[in-house]
Amino acid sequence: MAATVDEHAASEVLKGISRHLNCLNEENKLTRKRALESIKNQTVSKELPSDVLQEVFSSLLKPLLKCLSDPMEKCRETTIAIITDFIRCVPKPEEALPYLMPCLAQRFGDKEILEPSEEIRLLAVEMLALTVEVCGRHLAPYLNEMTNILKRTIVDPFPDVKKESCKCTVSFAKSVPEHFHMQAENLVKPLMQTITHQHSRVRVSVIEATGAVIQHGSGKNMDDVLSHLAQRLFDDSPQVRKAVTAVVGDWLLNMRDRYSYFHKLIPLLLTSISDEIPEIRLLAADLWRQAGLQWEKENEDDIKDKMDFLLSPPPHYPPGVDRPGLGCRELVVRNLSRLVPAIAHDVTDWLVPTRVRTSQLLSVLLLHAEDHTTQHLQPLLAVLYRACSDTERDVVNNCLAAAKLIGTFVPPPVFLKLMLEHVMTPNSPSYPWTPLMVLAAVLGGGSKPLLNPHLQQIADTLVQPEVSQEYQQVMYLEQLLACVDVLLYQCEADCGLISLQLLQVLVTIQSLSNDPQLSAKALESVHLLSKVQGLDSIELYRQHMGQLLDWLSASVNTWSSYSPQRLQLHIILMQSGPVPGEFLNQLMPLLHSCLQPNRDTEMRMSVFTMLAKLLLDAKNTLDSQGHFCDEAERFLSDVLLPNLVWHAGRTAAAVRTSALSCLLALLHGGAITPGQLLSLEVKLSPLVLSALDENSQMSRLLACRCLSATLKLIGTSLHHEALNKIYPELLKRLDDSSEEVRNIALETMDLWLSGLTKDYNPDLCAPHLQLLFQQLLLHLDDPDSSVQDRVLEVLKKGSRVHPSLLQREAEAVRDKQRSPHHCDLLLQHISSLPHTTCSNRPT
């Protein structure tokens, strides 16, 4: 009875709109528009009973579908609105599908878009989404039509159409899960074409649709999809990254064939655990925890034997880090062999964000793998070595954090067996420091009790010449220093066992470094090495000086200007204060060997310069024990004098200059006694006097200073013949081109005259004195008044030696000088002297 009533009501409605239906075929577009509006007002807008609407819809559907091709946009828009309202209101919308779906497929699913209006295409897709929602599984027979439509609308130029199409795809996949897989792969390509759209909301919708398509698909396109999703993990939009995280987590939990894809899905989800946005990190961690728990339940029988000991954390677990659940750890462990090669590939990607995220992922994986890392140590180390040469600092820091976990979870005997070999023979000649860099990080993650038995092995490797002396790059030396520092901080007082080796390495770093900051850091480490043993740095050197000198002496015969040993010697002697004076019996043979005239010239210059610094402060260095005098005479005769012998060439001249500076320091520093010097004066004086004629101003200056120092020490003990050989050479220097040399020559002449004793017979040596006075009187008329003043003072000293001779010579030249002023002052001074005879002798 009710059906009859509904049929009658529907018939009445249809009669009322029959004229409007006829008008739909009119040529006048306004007529068609008004007809459609009237149909809408008298049907769906009238709130008729649903059964009545069902009957009316069945009769109106075909005419309405024809209107989808109406030339007038407003007519098409109204038509879609009417059909949409009918689908929403009728109890059995699926009855319209046989006519609706082919029409929509023809209009919106062809290769070329027939509908030019973006807004109408959007309304059509919204209508399609509603159809999927209300018809559900009834759409299964129209799988091809739906797929064709979505293939086109997903790549529609209008962003809103794309988004609505993606939502429709998700709904459709869930509505017909048993059939969707047959066409799912046809939607992958348009989705991947759209996944890089400029609008982030579109990208989010595409990712969500991709999740549904793969979830309910056959899995054939998983690899293509994953590569695109992996790129979206680096998206600038947090919402996009969050969508990827949610989709991947859902796959891990719910995809039918998820076990086959664990090794591909796990890296994506774990990458999000390191995301910069807390919300994404929390979401990823929660999904990962759920995946682990689910895996535990599904594999309970396999892991029940491991439950007891796998639940307790390993010793020395990183503080402040939450340990992942058993299921999560097992998931990583069982897939690690397939994950490590992927990490190795991506960590060298050309895109910086990819390398950064991959390096972050490595730490997360190792935190899950724990002691299972041991099984994959070789490829993991290769990854770390390669990544630590990256120019991006974040990549390097992340990899060093991962390396620290290796030290935490892998036993030292295992990682040292591989790593020390890599340190000895780096695989990359361009980046030889990476094994040291990784070793320092690994040692930093180790524990003191486990490292202690291996300290000797580590230190013996670091001190090897091919490790500590082979490379001079600052980066290499920094990493070598980092290895020493980490041992000092990790093992502290136990480093006393390897104190010598560590000191040797630190000395080598300082000797090879051209970077003042690095040298300063190495010196700080020397102080730390002292401190952990309860010593100061001087005591540390005292403890090891004998061994250090033996270490250097072993190779002294092969030293050259390029040998690091000469620089090591410099560092040791300059930093050890008074200690060298306690080991002269070992030090002096070493110095004798490397300073022989036949040895490398630049090396000798370097060593002489160093010795000059030490000898100037001999009481606090080489002569700290007062024993250097026992070696001084031999050092002077066998080392210094042979290096003062003249040889042609600039390099030979430079060696003589450095030897003169060392001689001067020896004379000034008080490390040689007057008696020792006097015994060698016959050999020494000719060489020093010869140096007064050197081309080098510095050599002439040093030679003058050496004569001055010699006269101070033994001037009063020299025989008159020795004295008479000195002054002619000094007189030549009064005409030197260097004012400084002239000044020192005058000072030395002053000392020469002051040092004359009663043993010097002025009458016997009158010709010498006459020549001396004549030359000095010439310079008394020097254009430089300051020189005149200094010469006057020297002549006043000479007036005490033979005043009458000087008076005669002064009177003879007085009238020849440009100004007699200084001559008059000299004569006045001589007149004021006590009465003397011509044969007066100095007192």
Feature map (PLM): residue ranges:
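Extended, low-complexity, acidic/polar intrinsically disordered regions
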Residues: 1-843
